[in-house]
């Protein structure tokens, strides 16, 4: 039976939500009621699949905690008052921590002036952020297009590459196996997970995938495309594959790909949506090899965990195809004042506190601890790997990975799997994680593995 619209119901629901937003704390009955409401509304109005996923990785097989607020800079608090060390980082958005006061203050100050731009007059913060990114990014990257997410950033990069290379008769894109570049139609064509691709086939034509980290496979693909007249417009890569399971390529791989792109006249697009903004121990992961892309994609941590923002930064030569008609690719909310304020504050915090260097130091500490655990539990752990504060623990099978996430949840440490590699649990905490919290995370992982071994032996 069709349901009639109800203004009264919508008004009551929105008023109830606003009342909750105003409250700093909830009493016990309010917490219980909120839990019930959230689970019901996810089931009936968001997507029940999310509930089943949360049930599979949380303690006791329930639906898990209902997130209510940030705790400290590196923790989350649920409606029951339980505090979790955040080792997921919202899949890489909380590089400067939760509710970083510098970022929050910048957004609040801008909100008091002008939350959104007119679209017709020039907006100062977009100009200032573009100038800042031109100074911050490597090589000849100069012009920025702003959007709201990593997927949008990749879409813009693909369209920009097409606009630049189409007059040259180059239409093919090369991506890599295990890649994740987003789920909109263009970005999904570069993504390499059949689960996400098959329901939407056919995707955009002209995309090929080669094994990640295999430079000879890349050369062969470029050669074959040239021989068949399918000349390559661009190669798109993640410096480290995040959703693929935190897969690091062999040393020198990015440098070699850059040389191949130059040799074949292909653009190099680096997707640093997850690896950028200090995550791997450098401001951008490509800086570990001093590689300079033609187009760079950013998002996630660029907004400081406070505002959504993405950016596509390109050289003047490439970006100039948009000069004659800047409306060829635009978005209403891209580069809005609140998002730009958050991004400018985030960059300031990263540089002022030297967080990329901290990511390298604390990442080494955590990775050493995880590798020691891998040696102690070879029956459970296949490998620990990573760079900076982007790490992964790969288990011997999918079930053990899920059990580890559940046990860590019991230890009040939040972790999660990767979308393209179910055996792998990602460790991606804020770069602001303290040394003491790093030690607590390693202890929690040891307790989790010990409990899992007991369960296996008892079974």
From Swiss-Prot:
Keyword Disulfide bond recorded: no
Obligatory cofactor(s): pyridoxal 5'-phosphate
Gene Ontology terms describing biological process: L-lysine catabolic process; putrescine catabolic process
Annotated positions of the N6-(pyridoxal phosphate)lysine modification: 300
Function: Catalyzes the aminotransferase reaction from putrescine to 2-oxoglutarate, leading to glutamate and 4-aminobutanal, which spontaneously cyclizes to form 1-pyrroline. This is the first step in one of two pathways for putrescine degradation, where putrescine is converted into 4-aminobutanoate (gamma-aminobutyrate or GABA) via 4-aminobutanal. Also functions as a cadaverine transaminase in a a L-lysine degradation pathway to succinate that proceeds via cadaverine, glutarate and L-2-hydroxyglutarate.
PANTHER family to which the protein is assigned, alphabetical: AMINOTRANSFERASE CLASS III (PTHR11986), PUTRESCINE AMINOTRANSFERASE (PTHR11986:SF112)
Name of the protein described by the UniProt record: Putrescine aminotransferase
Native species: Escherichia coli O1:K1 / APEC
């Amino acid at each position: 039976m069709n349901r009639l619209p109800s203004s009264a119901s919508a008004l009551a629901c929105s008023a109830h939500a606003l009342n909750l937003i105003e409250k700093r704390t909830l009493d016990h009955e309010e917490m219980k009621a909120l839990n019930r409401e959230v689970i019901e509304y996810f089931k009936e109005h968001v997507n029940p699949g999310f509930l089943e996923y949360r049930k599979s990785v949380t303690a006791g097989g329930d639906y898990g905690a209902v997130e209510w607020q940030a705790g400290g800079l590196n923790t989350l608090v649920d409606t029951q008052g339980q505090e979790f060390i955040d080792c997921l980082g919202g899949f890489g958005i909380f590089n400067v921590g939760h509710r970083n006061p510098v970022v929050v203050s910048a957004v609040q100050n801008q909100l008091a002036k002008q939350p959104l731009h007119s679209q017709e007059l020039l907006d100062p913060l977009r100009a200032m952020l573009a100038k800042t990114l031109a100074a911050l990014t490597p090589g000849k990257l100069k012009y920025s297009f702003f959007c709201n997410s990593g997927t949008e950033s990749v879409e813009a990069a693909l369209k920009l590459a097409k606009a630049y290379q189409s007059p040259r008769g180059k239409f093919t894109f090369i991506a890599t196996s295990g890649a994740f570049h987003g789920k909109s139609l263009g970005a999904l064509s570069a993504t390499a997970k059949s689960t996400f691709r098959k329901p939407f086939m056919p995707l955009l034509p002209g995309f090929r995938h080669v094994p990640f980290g295999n430079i000879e496979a890349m050369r062969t693909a470029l050669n074959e495309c040239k021989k068949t007249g399918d000349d390559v417009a661009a190669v798109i890569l993640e410096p480290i594959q995040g959703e693929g399971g935190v897969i690091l390529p062999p040393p020198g791989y990015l440098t070699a790909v850059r040389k191949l792109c130059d040799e074949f006249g292909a653009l190099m697009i680096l997707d640093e949506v997850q690896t950028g903004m200090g995550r791997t121990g450098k401001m951008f992961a490509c800086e570990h090899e001093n590689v300079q892309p033609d187009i760079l994609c950013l998002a996630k941590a660029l907004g400081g965990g406070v505002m959504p923002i993405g950016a596509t930064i390109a050289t003047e030569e490439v970006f100039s195809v948009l000069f004659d008609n800047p409306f060829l690719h635009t978005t209403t909310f891209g580069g809005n004042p609140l998002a730009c304020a958050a991004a400018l504050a985030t960059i300031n915090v990263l540089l002022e506190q030297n967080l990329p260097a901290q990511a390298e130091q604390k990442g080494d500490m955590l990775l050493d601890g995880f590798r020691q655990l891998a040696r102690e539990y070879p029956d459970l752990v296949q490998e620990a790997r990573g760079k900076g504060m982007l790490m992964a623990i790969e288990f011997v099978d999918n079930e053990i990975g899920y059990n580890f996430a559940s046990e860590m949840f019991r230890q009040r440490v939040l972790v999660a799997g990767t979308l393209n590699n179910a055996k792998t649990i990602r460790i991606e905490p804020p770069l602001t994680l303290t040394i003491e919290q790093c030690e607590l995370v390693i202890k929690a992982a040891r307790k989790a593995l010990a409990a899992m071994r007991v369960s296996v032996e008892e079974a």
